[in-house]
C-alpha cells in the first residue's frame, strides 16, 4: 500500500526520483531506480536514441508556428502528430490558456499543424501534473505518425539487488507496467547483464522472443535492444524505459516513447547531455535550492520539513500526515552539510507564505548534529524566525547539539523522537 504522502504527491516526487520503484518478476523483485534530477524533453531523449542507431519516428522541433508548418511539409508523412513539449504527463488531455484543448494532435494537413502550433507556442498548457496555471510551451515536436500493430514494454536499469544492469520486458506495453506486474507477474521477463561482458546476443534474442517478436522482427528487436543497452552505458543512464516498444504494420520495430534517467555523479563526463537540462519548468524555489545542493519539492500543507535523506524525508512527511497535519514541502539536506546550507534551507522554508511551523528531523550519521544546531540558531536569529520550530536530532555529536540549542535562548521546541516531533509540530499549528 502506498504511504499517505506518496499517494498524495507521488507524481511530484517522481520528478526528483527520490524513491526506487519495484516490479515483481516471478519470486524476485526488480528495482527500478528512477533518479530524475536531470530533466530532458521528449524530443531530446528521442534525439539521443536516434543519434545512437535506435529507431524512432521521424521528427522535427519548432519554436514558432511557421517553423512547425515548414517541418510538417518537410516530413511529407501520411499523418502528422504535433506534441507540445513540456515535462509533465497528461498532455493529451491538457488545456491551453489560448482555449485549445489537448497538447497532442493528429492531422494529415500540414496547414493545420501551423494553425495548432500558433495556439500552443507561447501559451500555458495545464494538465493533471502541472500547477493550475499550467506550464508555458516554448517548443513543439512535429513527428511522423506511425501505426502501431503491437505494443510491448522494455527497460534497461541499474538493479541494486544484483549490483548491475537488468533488462526488463513485457509483451504487454502501452500501459502502466506496475499494473501488469501486479495482475500478471508471469508476463514480466528479465535478463541480468554482466557489466563487464555486456549484453549477449542470446539475451537480446531471448528477450525479443519473450516480448512476442517472431521471424525477421525478432532479429530486428534484438538489434534494437542491443543498441539501447549500448546507449544506456554510453550516457551513464540509470534507466532507459521504452513504452511502447512496438512494431508497425510495415514490419518495423520502433521506440515510440522513452524516458531516460541519468546518474548525477556522471555530469563531469556527460557535459553535453547535462547542458540540455531544462529547469525552466521548475518552481523558482526548486532552482534556488539546487544552487546549495538541496532537493526541494513544494507540497500543499503548512508544516515545513527539513530532513537529511530521502527515505527519512518521506517518513517525516507521512508521520505528519498520520498525526493530522499536512507537510508544506519535502526538503532533503543530504550529507556533507555546512552551516551555510542550513541557513539557506531556513531561508527557503520561511519564504513560503504557507509555512506555519517548521519541523527539523536530522539523523546524524555522516551529518554532524552540532553543525546543524549552529546553522539553526544562526538562521533563527538572522531571519528573525516567526513560526514555531520543532527540532529532533539524533546521532553524531547530538549532546553537543542539544547544548547549543538549549543555551541559545531561542524558542526552539525539542523532541525525543519522530513521533513526538510530529505531534508537537501539528499541535503548534493547531493552536493558531
Curated annotation (Swiss-Prot):
InterPro entries assigned: ATP-grasp_succ-CoA_synth-type, ATP_grasp_subdomain_1, Succ-CoA_synthase_bsu_CS, SUCC_ACL_C, Succ_CoA_betaG_euk, Succ_CoA_ligase-like_bsu, Succinyl-CoA_synth-like
EC numbers: 6.2.1.4
Pfam families assigned: ATP-grasp_2, Ligase_CoA
Binding-site residues for Mg(2+), renumbered to this chain: 243, 257
Residues in ATP-grasp domain copies: 46-274
Annotated cofactor note: Binds 1 Mg(2+) ion per subunit.
Tissue specificity remark: Mainly expressed in liver, kidney, heart, spleen and skeletal muscle. Also found in intestine and colon, and in low amounts in lung, brain, prostate, testis and ovary.
Site, Important for substrate specificity: residue positions: 79, 147
Subcellular localization, as worded in the UniProt entry: Mitochondrion
Keyword Acetylation part of the UniProt annotation: yes
Catalytic reaction(s) noted: GTP + succinate + CoA = succinyl-CoA + GDP + phosphate
UniProt keyword GTP-binding present: yes
Residue numbers binding substrate: 308, 365-367
GO cellular component, one term: succinate-CoA ligase complex (GDP-forming)
Cofactor requirements of the protein: Mg(2+)
Family under the similarity heading: Belongs to the succinate/malate CoA ligase beta subunit family. GTP-specific subunit beta subfamily.
Classification via PANTHER family: SUCCINATE--COA LIGASE [GDP-FORMING] SUBUNIT BETA, MITOCHONDRIAL, SUCCINYL-COA SYNTHETASE BETA CHAIN
Protein name as it appears in the record: Succinate--CoA ligase [GDP-forming] subunit beta, mitochondrial
Gene: SUCLG2
Amino acid at each position: 500500500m502506498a504511504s499517505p504522502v506518496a499517494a498524495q504527491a507521488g507524481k511530484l516526487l517522481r520528478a526528483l526520483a527520490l524513491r526506487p520503484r519495484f516490479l515483481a518478476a516471478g519470486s524476485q523483485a526488480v528495482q527500478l531506480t528512477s533518479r530524475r534530477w536531470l530533466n530532458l524533453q521528449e524530443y531530446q531523449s528521442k534525439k539521443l536514441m536516434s543519434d545512437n542507431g535506435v529507431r524512432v519516428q521521424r521528427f522535427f522541433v519548432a519554436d514558432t508556428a511557421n517553423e512547425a508548418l515548414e517541418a510538417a511539409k518537410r516530413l511529407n508523412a501520411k499523418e502528422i502528430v504535433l506534441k507540445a513539449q513540456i515535462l509533465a504527463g497528461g498532455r493529451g488531455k491538457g488545456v491551453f490558456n489560448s482555449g485549445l484543448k489537448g497538447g497532442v494532435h493528429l492531422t494529415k494537413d500540414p496547414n493545420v499543424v501551423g494553425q495548432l502550433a500558433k495556439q500552443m507556442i507561447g501559451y500555458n498548457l495545464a494538465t493533471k501534473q502541472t500547477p493550475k496555471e499550467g506550464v508555458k510551451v516554448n517548443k513543439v515536436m512535429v513527428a511522423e505518425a506511425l501505426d502501431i500493430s503491437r505494443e510491448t514494454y522494455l527497460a534497461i536499469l541499474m538493479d541494486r539487488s544484483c549490483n548491475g544492469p537488468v533488462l526488463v520486458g513485457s509483451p504487454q506495453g502501452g500501459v502502466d507496467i506496475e499494473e501488469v506486474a501486479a495482475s500478471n507477474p508471469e508476463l514480466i521477463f528479465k535478463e541480468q547483464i554482466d557489466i563487464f561482458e555486456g549484453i549477449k546476443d542470446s539475451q537480446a534474442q531471448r528477450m525479443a522472443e519473450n516480448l512476442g517478436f517472431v521471424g525477421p522482427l525478432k532479429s530486428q528487436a534484438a538489434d534494437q535492444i542491443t543498441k539501447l543497452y549500448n546507449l544506456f552505458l554510453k550516457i551513464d543512464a540509470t534507466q532507459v524505459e521504452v513504452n511502447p516498444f512496438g512494431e508497425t504494420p510495415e514490419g518495423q520495430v520502433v521506440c515510440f516513447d522513452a524516458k531516460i534517467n541519468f546518474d548525477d555523479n556522471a555530469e563531469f563526463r556527460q557535459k553535453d547531455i547535462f547542458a540540455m537540462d531544462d529547469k525552466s519548468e521548475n518552481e523558482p524555489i526548486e532552482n534556488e535550492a539546487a544552487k546549495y545542493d538541496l532537493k526541494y519539492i513544494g507540497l500543499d500543507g503548512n508544516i515545513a520539513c527539513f530532513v537529511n535523506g530521502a527515505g527519512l524525508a518521506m517518513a517525516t512527511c507521512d508521520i505528519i500526515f498520520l498525526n493530522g497535519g499536512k507537510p508544506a514541502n519535502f526538503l532533503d539536506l543530504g550529507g556533507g552539510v555546512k552551516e551555510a546550507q542550513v541557513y539557506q534551507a531556513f531561508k527557503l522554508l520561511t519564504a513560503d507564505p504557507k509555512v506555519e511551523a517548521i519541523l527539523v528531523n536530522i539523523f546524524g550519521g555522516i551529518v554532524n548534529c552540532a553543525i546543524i544546531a549552529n546553522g539553526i540558531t544562526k538562521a533563527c536569529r538572522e531571519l528573525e524566525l516567526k513560526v514555531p520550530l520543532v527540532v529532533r536530532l539524533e546521532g553524531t555529536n547530538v549532546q553537543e547539539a542539544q547544548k547549543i540549542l538549549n543555551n541559545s535562548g531561542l524558542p526552539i521546541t525539542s523532541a525525543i523522537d519522530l513521533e513526538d516531533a510530529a505531534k508537537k509540530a501539528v499541535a503548534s499549528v493547531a493552536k493558531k
